[in-house]
Amino acid sequence: MEALKADVTKGLERGSLVTCADNTGARELKVISVMGSSGTKNRHPKAGIGDQVTVSVTKGTPEMRRQVLEAVIVRQRKSIRRPDGTRVKFEDNAAVIIDEMEEPRGTEIKGPIAREVAERFGSIASTATMIV
């Protein structure tokens, strides 16, 4: 996984509810853990745009509910700062479910995704309709 160019402020922590931005059948996801976070004692792991997280499906089709899956954060409400000084924030917190090869499980992604996600995950960028 390559480093992001933007200064991403981590806007989500363990237990946060995010919307699912693809058509896998899941509607709402709960963040269980963050990949690669080795924190301090009693400190919640935080996640931001482009981070890979483990999620549990809280709302969706009966086949998808209560499954534990991997996902990538593609939108967050907390603003992030880009190298040119602009700040970007979205209307909601959203994630895309991925498989073990880091390919999206769905065939389409609803809504825009951040450019930082497109740089790190090319397969998600090719599926997305809008990159901001």
From Swiss-Prot:
Glycoprotein in keyword set: no
Among Gene3D superfamilies, the record links this protein to: Ribosomal protein L14
The highest taxon in the source lineage is Archaea
Record keywords, A-Z: Ribonucleoprotein, Ribosomal protein, RNA-binding, rRNA-binding
- Which is one Gene Ontology cellular component term of this protein? cytosolic large ribosomal subunit
GO MF term set: large ribosomal subunit rRNA binding; structural constituent of ribosome
One of the GO biological process terms: translation
Matching entries from SUPFAM superfamilies are given as: Ribosomal protein L14 (SSF50193)
User: Carries keyword Aminoacyl-tRNA synthetase?
Assistant: no
Q: How does it assemble?
A: Part of the 50S ribosomal subunit. Forms a cluster with proteins L3 and L24e, part of which may contact the 16S rRNA in 2 intersubunit bridges.
Among PANTHER family, the record links this protein to: 50S/60S RIBOSOMAL PROTEIN L14/L23, LARGE RIBOSOMAL SUBUNIT PROTEIN UL14
Q: Which family does it belong to?
A: Belongs to the universal ribosomal protein uL14 family.
Q: What does this protein do?
A: Binds to 23S rRNA. Forms part of two intersubunit bridges in the 70S ribosome.
What HAMAP family does UniProt report for this protein, alphabetically?
Answer: Ribosomal_uL14
Q: What is this protein called?
A: Large ribosomal subunit protein uL14
Q: Which organism is it from?
A: Haloquadratum walsbyi (strain DSM 16790 / HBSQ001)
- Source species taxonomy: Archaea, Methanobacteriati, Methanobacteriota, Stenosarchaea group, Halobacteria
